[in-house]
Amino acid sequence: MIGYRQTLLVFLLMMLSGAAIAQNNTNSPYTRYGYGQLADQGSGNSKAMGGIAYGLRDKYQVNFANPASYTAIDSLTFIFDGGISLQNTNFSNGTIKQNAKNSSFDYITMQFRLGKWAAMSLGLLPYSNVGYSMAEYKEDTDYPSQSSALQYYGDGGLHQLYLGAGFKVLKNLSVGANISYFWGDITHTRAITFPGNSSTLPLTTITGTSIQSYKLDIGAQYTQVFGKKHEATLGIVFSPGHDLNNDSYVEDRLGNEKTGTTVCIELDHLR
């Protein structure tokens, strides 16, 4: 059995690593929509096999995509797993090309045996990421003073802390469940300025959303053995849907903060 001191030490390491996971390491204009770019909900072992996860069952790997897989671990094993990803992306609009390189600390998980028929896992991983910065200049040749510069940028994302357990109910059948806590803040900003007209104040619109909610995943795995060396595992996961609890606002700022001429208008909270 795993000692409580060792478990506590690993849990503290997970919390310290949460600061690295919470950092935004995304640079994509597509994250403007929805909750941003959804993170790949899979471990390194799952990604190496093309994203397959529900049927994976390995006593040396944490498969948090299906909590029924936790029972594969033996009583002498304690698993502490982390993931890092690197991304190299090229963007093009037909005339302009841009390259973006990003790195991120994907997940921190641990898994251990509770008893002969039960095992537990907990971990911290990202759920979505928002990160972009774009600019557009609209030139008015007839009235240069009305030429405008638009800027769009956003950041934030959602994070997921889960606790799960798996149980072996029959020799070849295991079931399990993960309960996850979601939290995060997402901010989108749109700014318009008029470089050729100093008398026209710039306008900045900030849309922010703060989310705190939960997620439940229920999984099952059935393993059929063929001979002495081969077996096949069928996995299934059910996640009940529900609305995320969120607190949103829209704020308009009229003026130039450098000169101190700023007017803030905060609208009613959106639910």
What are these regions (language model features)?
Residues 23-48, 113-271:
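Outer-membrane beta-barrel porins/channels
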Residues 6, 11, 36-39, 54, ...:
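Generic hydrophobic alpha-helical membrane-segment signal
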Residues 10, 57-58, 130, 183:
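Residue-level recognition of conserved structural "scaffold" positions that shape functional pockets
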Residues 1-27:
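Bacterial Sec-dependent N-terminal signal peptides
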Residues 21-128:
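N-terminal, post-signal peptide beta-strand-biased segments of exported outer-membrane/organellar beta-barrel
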